UniProtKB/Swiss-Prot annotation:
Protein name, entry field: DNA ligase
The keyword NAD belongs to this UniProt entry's keyword annotation: yes
Gene3D superfamilies: 5' to 3' exonuclease, C-terminal subdomain, 6.20.10.30, BRCT domain, DNA ligase/mRNA capping enzyme, Helix hairpin bin, Nucleic acid-binding proteins
UniProt organism field: Neisseria gonorrhoeae (strain ATCC 700825 / FA 1090)
GO MF terms, alphabetically ordered: DNA ligase (NAD+) activity; metal ion binding
Record-listed NAD(+) binding positions: D38, A39, E40, Y41, D42, S87, L88, E127, R150, E187, K305, K329
Any one Gene Ontology BP term: DNA repair
Ligand binding (Zn(2+)): C455, C458, C473, C479
Cofactor: Mg(2+); Mn(2+)
Family label: Belongs to the NAD-dependent DNA ligase family. LigA subfamily.
Family annotation (SMART domains): BRCT (SM00292), LIGANc (SM00532)
């Protein structure tokens, strides 16, 4: 007896129809070889719909009727990616005026790969770089159970219901080698023909058309009503396996692609391939660039990957991108337009960026009205002026920039000039004997552009430090533009993560002078928010076009009690978000301060090296310059920030307002990075090699006191230390090192963390029963440990939860210790 014979007739027919319709859909969408007429497919589809409507309990998880969508959702749930969805580094091959490509960046990529493989000869797979939306598909026992967007690479949104409406995504995998679990990464996009049809419908219905297929695909996939998504005709192409259990385990990426096709996925047939060397790769890239207009989908380049998965593993990753792959972008699309004006934008750090205001022009799929001119040197080099006809490019197909001026089209004017009498005298126009045409010359209508001397926002002087390309407004937090941008950064998710306080609210608070400094955020109360809202509403009502309505957004919701306006929950949510963010991790707090050159990674390094805010505030510049990934320029910027009385006062004000950055164990002891031979070489105004610095240290009795007082030390050292500022610096260094924990103390942790955690490398895999991944990571890092994304021989512990995959298998193979969540907590206590 087969499976169907054991069922009742209705269940049997539902199974038969589901299998039939899925097979027919595969033939139509993937093989492009339908075996039945459309009318017959529609008849069978309607039969299945009727059976499922009358017997919903018999509906199968891979039923093709799910592709029509369902009732709207209230919102999208978050999905934590088991394996982060990383980005790729970009490489460009600019063309000269004869259309010849300069492939220097790709040859450099090939050389880096070869160096990483110790001279090995890699094969490469080249695929189209689709201009769509990256998603991840999770299948268990062959059935699609979850689909998620990329999000920030770590956390995305659950779009399973919408993805099930995409016709060429199999709801159940095909073939004989179906894995127990597989997570497929790929791109959702909209074909050019479907995009044109969608925009025609939008126009006919009086709705705004989409700017490009990518925007249409992204907007369609994130519809809360999956029935709308179903109408939009999205398409999917797979490009990688994130994790897999069972099934056919490939050894090469080209085998993965073939496996995708066997499982029922569509591939961009004819537009990908495997090549033996970089020369063949580049020839195929140029072929694809020529073929680009004919393709049924938008691409903005190709993706080049090392074919061997073992070689991919050997090469590994750098930062947030793999070393074994690169996005080889096509030359950006360009267009001509006219510069109508040039003004400046003021950034968070006071950076003054000249911006060209342009006649609207369609470039690279979007309408461009502004383009960056980068800085004064670039404006002068390109000689961009108001009225010029310019070539505009979307650099990297993202940021519009002015490439060059078409000087032949520059607007000119005739101006009178003095005329020589031939013997060295100048005649004025009244007595000139030459024709009038010779008494004038054609000169540009507009003068060369120069940055203003003062900030257009706060009228502070614009200054440019020697050696710096960027000019900056000197107003600091006195400048409204810098205040707003600084506060937006301070409250952002990666900084203080103040939930509920968005850019529009901060801009309103600053514009109305209700908030001037970081600490002012912690003094906000209901009356302040109410005043902000009322002023925003007043501005909205006075705006003829109604554009200001979005400024207050959800702030416009009010309840009325006893005839008096009362703020609704939005205000209380903002206050709750401010209150809950008062105890940030030290690294987040340092990043939030907006110190120039200090990003997330540098902030984390500072936290790991010093453990407390007070130590960071007092860290001498030579010590800072010794830290990993922190050079002289960054160290000087950090030291300068904390040397300013107003910045120290600002931090004190935050602490007084109740902000309390969390101290953490020192996982990067000073002895590991700031040996005396290193910080001595970084003393300002004293040039010495590390070998001579070590000798000087030994002559001084291996103590800072000796450096301060020993009169037998070399004359050049005694001359240096005799200066008052250097005497003070040595005293500061002595005090600082005395307060830092020793290497043994650091290993134990500043608050008693034992050696099993501090300095150890952990890898998290699977779903933990209590903690989210980022919570567990925060606990480990606060205890002085490090969290890595991949398992290697250097891994100390793997913490495994439910559905732990290949990382657990690799840990067992390498003999790495595996912990449960409970065992991790025991280790941390």
């Amino acid at each position: 007896m087969n499976l169907y014979e054991s069922m009742n007739p209705t269940a049997q027919r539902i199974h038969e129809l589901t299998d039939l319709l899925n097979r027919y859909a595969y033939e139509y969408y993937t093989l492009d070889a339908p075996s039945i007429p459309d009318a017959e497919y529609d008849r069978l589809f309607r039969e299945l719909e009727a059976l499922e409507r009358n017997h919903p309990e018999l509906k199968l998880p891979d039923s093709p009727t799910q592709r029509v969508g369902g009732e709207p959702l209230a919102g999208f749930a978050e999905v934590r990616h088991e394996v982060p969805m990383l980005s790729l580094t970009n490489a460009f091959s600019p063309q000269d005026e004869n259309g010849v490509f300069d492939h220097a960046e790709m040859y450099a990529f090939d050389q880096r790969v070869r160096d990483g493989l110790d001279g090995g000869n890699p094969e490469y797979v080249i695929e189209p770089k689709f201009d769509g939306l990256a998603i991840s598909l999770l299948y268990r026992d062959g059935v699609l159970v979850q689909a998620a967007t990329r999000g920030d690479g770590t956390t995305g949104e659950d779009v399973t219901r919408n993805v099930k409406t995409v016709s060429n995504i199999p709801l159940r995998l095909h073939g004989e080698n179906v894995p127990e679990l597989i997570e497929v990464r790929g791109e959702v996009l909209m074909l050019k023909a479907d995009f044109a049809a969608l925009n025609q419908r939008q126009t006919e219905n009086g709705q705004k058309p989409f700017a490009n297929p990518r925007n249409a695909a992204a907007g369609s996939l994130r519809q809360l009503d999956s029935r709308i998504t179903a109408q939009r005709k999205l398409h999917f192409f797979p490009y990688s396996v994130a994790r897999q259990q069972g099934g056919l385990i490939a050894e090469e990426h080209i085998q993965e692609l073939a496996y995708f096709q066997a499982l029922g996925f569509s591939l961009p047939n004819g537009n990908f391939g495997c090549f033996k060397n970089i020369g063949e790769v580049l020839a195929f890239y140029e072929h694809m660039q020529q073929k680009r207009p004919e393709l049924p989908y938008e691409i903005d380049g190709t993706v080049v990957k090392v074919n061997s998965l073992a070689q991919q593993h050997e090469l590994g990753f750098i930062s947030r991108a793999p070393r074994w792959a690169v996005a080889h972008k096509f030359p950006a699309e360009e267009a001509l337009t006219i510069v109508e004006a040039i003004d400046v934008q003021i950034g968070r750090t006071g950076a003054v960026t000249p911006v060209a205001r342009l006649q609207p022009v369609f470039v690279g799929g979007v309408t461009v009205t502004n383009a960056t001119l980068h800085n004064q040197d670039e404006v002068s080099r390109k000689d961009v002026r108001v009225g010029d006809t310019v070539v505009v490019r979307r650099a990297g197909d993202v940021i519009p920039e002015v490439v060059r001026v078409i000087f032949e089209r520059r607007p000119m004017q005739e101006t009178a000039v003095a005329v020589s009498d031939g013997i060295g005298h100048q005649q004025d126009d009244l007595f000139a004997e030459t024709p009038s045409a010779k008494q004038t010359e054609s000169v540009p209508l507009h003068k060369p552009y120069r940055l203003p001397a003062r900030c257009p926002i706060c009228r502070s002087e614009i200054e440019r430090e020697e050696g710096e390309a960027v000019a900056r407004c000197s107003g600091g937090m006195l400048c409204q533009a810098q205040r707003a941008q600084g506060l937006i950064h301070f409250a952002s998710r990666k900084a203080m993560d103040i939930d509920g306080l968005g850019e529009k609210q901060i801009e309103q608070l600053v514009a109305q002078d209700l908030v001037r400094h970081f600490a002012d955020l912690y003094r906000i109360d209901i009356p302040t928010l109410q005043k902000m809202k009322e002023t925003a509403d007043k501005g909205s009502s006075e705006n003829e076009n109604g554009d200001a309505e979005t400024v207050s957004g959800d702030l416009s919701k009010y309840n009325t009690q006893n005839g008096k306006k009362q703020p609704t929950k939005w205000a209380q949510n903002i206050l709750a978000g401010i209150e809950s963010g008062k105890t940030p991790e030290l690294a987040r707090f340092l990043f939030a301060l907006g110190i120039r050159h200090v990003g997330e990674r540098t902030a984390k390094t500072l936290a790991q090296a010093f453990g407390t805010l007070e130590r960071v505030r007092r860290a001498p510049e030579p010590v800072l310059a010794c830290l990993p990934d922190i050079g002289t320029v960054v160290a000087r910027s950090i030291a300068h920030f904390f040397a300013q009385a107003e910045q120290q006062a600002m931090i004190d004000e935050l602490l007084a307002a109740g902000v309390a950055p969390q101290a953490q164990a020192v996982s990067l002891p000073a002895a590991q990075y700031a040996g005396p031979q290193r910080w001595i070489t970084r003393l300002p105004g004293f040039k010495i090699s590390e070998n001579k610095a070590q000798a000087l240290w030994e002559l001084a009795g291996q103590s800072i006191e000796g450096l301060q007082n020993d009169k037998a030390l070399p004359a050049d050292w005694q001359a240096w230390r005799s200066k008052a500022q250097n005497t003070a610096l040595l005293e500061n260094l002595k005090t600082f090192f005395a307060q830092m924990p020793s290497e043994d103390e650091a290993a134990q942790g500043s608050d008693g963390i034992n050696k099993a955690v501090a300095g150890k490398t952990f890898v998290l895999t699977g779903t933990l029963p209590t903690f989210k991944r980022d919570q567990a990571q925060a606990l480990i890092e606060a205890a002085g440990g490090k969290v890595s994304g991949s398992v290697s021989k250097k891994t100390d512990y793997v913490v495994a939860g439910e559905t732990a995959g290949s990382k657990l298998e690799k840990a067992n193979a390498l003999g790495v210790s595996v912990l449960s969540e409970a065992e991790l907590l025991t280790l941390l206590c």
